[in-house]
Amino acid sequence: MKEFDIISIGGGSGGIATMNRAGEHGARAAVIEEKQLGGTCVNRGCVPKKIMWYGAQIAEAIRDYGPDYGFTSEQTRFDFATLRKNREAYIDRSRNSYDGSFKRNGVERIEGRARFVDAHTIEVNGETIKAKHIVIATGAHPFIPSVPGAEFGETSDDVFAWEELPSSVAIIGAGYIAVELAGVLHHLGVQTDLFIRKDRVLRSFDSYIVDGLMEEMKKQNLPLHKHKVPMKLEKLEDGRVKIYFEDMTSHVADHVIWATGRKPNVQDLNLEAAGVTLNEKGFIAVDEYQNTVIPGIYALGDVTGEKELTPVAIKAGRTLSERLFNGKVNAKMDYTNIPTVVFSHPAIGTVGLTKEEAQQTYGKENIKVYTSQFASMYTAVTQHRQQAKFKLITAGPEEKVVGLHGLGYGVDEMIQGFAVAIKMGATKADFDATVAIHPTGSEEFVTMR
């Protein structure tokens, strides 16, 4: 029987980071993964999405902005096979890098599906393995609604397996995955329609920024269909898929993509044998230290439903290993002021509270809001002027910055530095005292009045 100090069930970003940090501190660590290392992010999420987003950015630049910069594009041809080949080569290099980090840190890789036998014992491929500490980092998978014909729809996982782009696609969902896929496919030349249940996309984001994005989607001729609740999917004889909605309308597309949320990967883990419990939403219940209800068993990342972002899982995992193996007994992940980017067209960057959240937290009378709206210089010299919208939210007499939100060209690369400032408790006066970099979009954040 193999024995370890710590094991991760799941070889995604969170599990890998946790075990590598534990190994750095001398722990006997192992990662159990039945599929490819890297999890959703590397294989079916952040990485392939971002590469395709870059491709869409290039297509947008050639089509919309190139002519006004003096570049003609009559002969430009897009070959998706080339993008796909280079995307997959990059992903392969990323996956291969894990073997090197495991070797440096003494982490063992075990291929197979794990299930609990008891609180300190798991079974993999018929073999029993024991560990003092077990981390559940199994991630999540796309949720597919229970409607007739749902199986004729696909998910984001399937999109990244396409060998060629379709002529048309219908995306169902209003979250960041739906918005990002819609933008990417639209700008790569696919007839893309986005269907949402209510009247807004990204409903948890600041309304000022979301309004701006929806205006840009309209200008870019990306159809957004509101108040559309799918009732049934049907496969037509020509291979296309027809969606029937509750309002008695319908739509036909080559592919239908479900982007309706994600569910935790807890099936077949035999959690009952270990005594691990789920919360009311079906995610593994943990406290602020990533502890489950069973001592020695932890969970982090998407399987907990807490801020489902790759860097959050990585940070939580490294912090856990610092607590367990480096004497930092009070170390825990701080889930406040986590910066987030939506790779839409244009991108959204945000950190801290929305206006609505700030009003609830501090009281409407105690907050102050600053906004700025302009056309980014990159697009302002062209016929396709793209708006940028920036917003600062401050609280209290000292005007502590509690929320920063941006929509516009380059926002995705701006937000990290401002997140540091907000994490440190910067005030509006601190922002005002900072000399602007001109001409940039980011200068708007330090010149608002």
Where are these regions (language model features)?
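A conserved FAD-binding loop/helix module that cradles the flavin
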Residues: G212, L300-Q359, D430, H438-R449
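FAD-site-proximal beta/loop scaffold in flavoenzymes
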Residues: E151-P166, H251-G327
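Flexible, glycine-rich terminal cap/loop adjacent to redox cofactors
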Residues: I7-G14, T18-K35, T40, V47, ...
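A Rossmann-like FAD-binding core segment of flavoenzymes
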Residues: E111, R115-E123, I129, L188-E288, ...
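Glycine-rich dinucleotide-binding loop and its adjacent helix/turn
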Residues: C46, T138-Q191, P223-L224, E272-A274, ...
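Beta1/beta-strand and adjacent pyrophosphate-binding region of the FAD-binding site
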Residues: M1-G12, L165-I172
